[in-house]
């Protein structure tokens, strides 16, 4: 008789996701074998914004695709609240509940649209996960408006919309599921500066509403703007983590990476080199150029 091993959930109060000893191989046990994730472990708290950065091919997207079951772990364990995703499972239990808990906004979410009206596209996810048509319809109108489009768009064909409008519709469909965790994979790809600012506002709003947010990006100024914690991957390994200033002020670490320092951090470093009194700017930890200007004015005013 097989001994049943009871799995112990490692999550504590205030935590939402735990990853333990996760490894992932492509083309495993062949001459083309590649180790994409290398023994990754981390525990993520609720209601924080995590930015995952690193070179192309460092394993960022592969990592987050494990979080909602798009990729099932071959090695290692993942807990999302009380839902277990593990190497020994044939299939993930509570799969629908997992998808309700974690949703991914892919790099070009507009390519996920496939219905003949905007309303049907937004309603698709909530209905697939068990909501009534009535409830899904109400959420379609609500989240479309949250994305800056009027209710009159509901009956429009999504394929007649502009690229930016399509992206808003696709994101509205994901928000309508009302997940506790949102993952954004290169959310600003192809956006103009105003679109980037709008996306950062969306991420801040998601945190303000109590959600946990993951963002994969190569735009370091956006990382500084929104991140509570930064995780740096290299060849599938977690090589550094901390708040944005801990990461971006570590010159010895950055020297061995291709990470481009955000302009705000570079200006602070230059000012400190000119006059050490500007070291107090590090106490303000400005996240953008406006905050930096305020911090500089404050420093000058108080001599």
From Swiss-Prot:
An annotated GO cellular component: ATP-binding cassette (ABC) transporter complex
Subcellular location, record wording: Cell membrane
Keywords: ATP-binding, Cell membrane, Membrane, Nucleotide-binding, Translocase, Transport
PROSITE patterns: ABC_TRANSPORTER_1, ABC_TRANSPORTER_2, CBIO
Membrane topology designation: Peripheral membrane protein
Chain ranges of the ABC transporter domain: 17-260
Translocase in keyword set: yes
Coiled coil: none
UniProt-listed Pfam families: ABC_tran (PF00005)
Positions of ATP binding: 54-61
Enzyme class: translocase
Record bears the keyword Magnesium: no
InterPro entries: AAA+_ATPase (IPR003593), ABC_transporter-like_ATP-bd (IPR003439), ABC_transporter-like_CS (IPR017871), ABC_transpr_CbiO/EcfA_su (IPR015856), ECF_ABC_transporter_ATP-bd (IPR050095), EcfA2 (IPR030946), P-loop_NTPase (IPR027417)
NCBIfam families assigned: ECF_ATPase_2, PRK13631.1
Record text on subunit structure and interactions: Forms a stable energy-coupling factor (ECF) transporter complex composed of 2 membrane-embedded substrate-binding proteins (S component), 2 ATP-binding proteins (A component) and 2 transmembrane proteins (T component).
Protein function: ATP-binding (A) component of a common energy-coupling factor (ECF) ABC-transporter complex. Unlike classic ABC transporters this ECF transporter provides the energy necessary to transport a number of different substrates.
PANTHER family named in the record: ENERGY-COUPLING FACTOR TRANSPORTER ATP-BINDING PROTEIN ECFA2 (PTHR43553:SF27), HEAVY METAL TRANSPORTER (PTHR43553)
Family recorded in the similarity comment: Belongs to the ABC transporter superfamily. Energy-coupling factor EcfA family.
Protein's UniProt name: Energy-coupling factor transporter ATP-binding protein EcfA2
Organism: Mycoplasma pneumoniae (strain ATCC 29342 / M129 / Subtype 1) (Mycoplasmoides pneumoniae)
């Amino acid at each position: 008789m097989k001994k049943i091993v009871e799995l112990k959930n490692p999550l504590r109060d205030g935590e939402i996701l735990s990853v333990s000893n996760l490894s992932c191989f492509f083309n495993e046990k062949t001459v083309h074998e590649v180790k994409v994730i290398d023994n990754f472990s981390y525990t993520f708290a609720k209601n924080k914004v995590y930015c995952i950065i690193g070179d192309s091919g460092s394993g960022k997207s592969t990592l987050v695709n494990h979080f909602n079951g798009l990729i099932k772990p071959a090695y290692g364990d993942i807990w999302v609240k009380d839902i277990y995703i593990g190497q020994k499972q044939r299939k993930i239990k509570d799969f629908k509940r997992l998808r309700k808990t974690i949703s991914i906004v892919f790099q070009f979410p507009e390519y996920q649209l496939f219905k003949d009206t905007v309303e049907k596209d937004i309603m698709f996810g909530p209905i697939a996960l068990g909501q009534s048509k009535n409830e899904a319809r109400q959420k379609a109108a609500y989240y479309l408006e949250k994305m800056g489009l009027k209710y009159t768009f509901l009956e429009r064909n999504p394929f007649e919309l502009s690229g930016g409008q399509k992206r808003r519709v696709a994101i509205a469909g994901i928000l309508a599921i009302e997940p506790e965790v949102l993952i954004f994979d290169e959310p600003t790809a192809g956006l103009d500066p105003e679109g980037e600012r709008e996306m950062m506002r969306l991420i801040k709003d998601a945190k303000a509403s109590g959600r946990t947010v993951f963002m994969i990006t190569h735009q370091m100024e956006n990382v500084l703007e929104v991140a509570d914690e930064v995780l740096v991957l290299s060849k599938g390994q977690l090589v550094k983590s901390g708040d944005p200033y801990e990461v971006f002020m570590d010159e010895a670490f950055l020297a061995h990476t291709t990470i481009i320092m955000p302009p705000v951090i570079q200006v602070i470093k230059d000012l400190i080199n000119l006059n050490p009194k500007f070291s107090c700017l590090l106490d303000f930890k400005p996240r953008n150029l406006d905050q930096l200007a305020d911090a500089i004015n404050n420093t000058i005013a108080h001599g």
